[in-house]
Structures are given as structure tokens and as C-alpha cells.
Amino acid sequence: MNMQEFKIFKDQNNSNLKFDFSLKNLNWMNIGGSAKVFFKPENLKELISFLKIVPKYKKHVLGAGSNLLISEKLGEKIFIKLGKNFSNISLIDDNKLIAGCSSLDKNVSDFACENGLSGLEFLSCIPGSVGGGIRMNSGCFGSEFKDFLVSIQVIDFEGKVSSIRTKDIIFGYRKCNLPYDLIFLSATFECKKSNKAVSYTHLTLPTMI
């Protein structure tokens, strides 16, 4: 791995690029070694610029780390974790919202309830991020990501941004057919119009025995 090109990129972009960076604090098990190169882009422009200099290297995208075991030996793989600007959540219609894929599932559920949208209450029980939820088609209490997902915006490892409709994705139990050379950027969800009080009532989920 030619570290000089990464150091030049860091100097030119003042980016959040780190070397020999421990990943232990980025997963819930607090295990794993150090990434030779770790990048946390704060916006899409930074991410595109970085991807253009790393086409020949293996890459892995990190989410919330709630369902992840990291090896002590990571080799020369590059690790990418989306920054805070990829966790924005906003309304785009009376019954639709868009969430950055580094948003925590619970934050999306809370946002929907606060805005009188029903359907995403189940996300409050899923410990993870939107991106990981899409990848695994996470779900509980009879609902899954695919039930409310309209489309996702993605970027491939060559830096090309595109949108994929849910109907063009094959979802299964805790899986989907999207290739692993895609980074999920944002997701659009369609909910049911309700009101805040009713939506929060739905958060009182059945007691597990």
C-alpha cells in the first residue's frame, strides 16, 4: 500500500483520514485491530474525492458496529465510516422522510413519531444504523426495512452516485442482493400519516418473555 498518496490527500483536503487507527471503539464488542487507513468523510464531496484515489484497494464500510466482529489482523483493507452529515433526517412529503444512512435506527423512529408519522416505531428496538438495516433488511415485531423503504441513494467504489428503487432490490430474511461495492448514503421511507400521540403510543411494544 502506497501510504504517500494517502498522506498527500490528507494534507490537501484537511480530511478526517487516520493511519493505524484502532477500530475497537467502533463496534459494540470492543474488539479488533487497527486499520492501516481509516476515513470518515463529512460530506459527499470528500467521499467522492477519496474514492478516486483508492480504486485498487479493498474497502469495508462500517456502520454502528452493533452486529460486527472485527479481526485483530486487518491487512491492508481500507475502512470507511460516514460522518455526521450523513445522519441528517428530514421530511420530504406529508408521509415521507429521508434519512442519512449513518442515522441510528432509533433516531429515525423518534423523528417519525415527532412528526406524526406511523410505521417506523419498530426501528426503536433495532440497535444499528439505517445503512446496516438496509443491508440486513432488519426487522422486528412483524415489520422489516423493506416494508417502508422507497429508495436509497448509493455511491459505488468508483465514486458514481445513483438511486435504487426498493422494487429493484431483492430482500430476504436479514439480507438483500445489493452488491458490497456500494456505500449507502441516504434512504427514503414512506410512512402512514398519524399524529404524535398515536405514534408514540405504538412505541409501547409487546413484552418479551
Predicted regions and their residues:
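Anion-binding (especially nucleotide phosphate/pyrophosphate-binding) glycine-rich loop
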Residues: M3-V130
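Structural signature of FAD isoalloxazine-binding scaffolds in flavoprotein oxidoreductases
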Residues: G32-G33, F39-L44, L69-S87, R135-R165, ...
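Short, conserved charged micro-motifs
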Residues: E46-S49, N195-S199
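Short, glycine- and charge-enriched coil/turn segments that flank and shape catalytic ligand pockets
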Residues: K56, S90-K96, E158-K160, Y180-D181, ...
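Flexible, small-/acidic-enriched active-site or ligand-binding loops
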Residues: D168-N177
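Single conserved hydrophobic/aromatic residue that forms the stacking wall/gate
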Residues: H202-I209
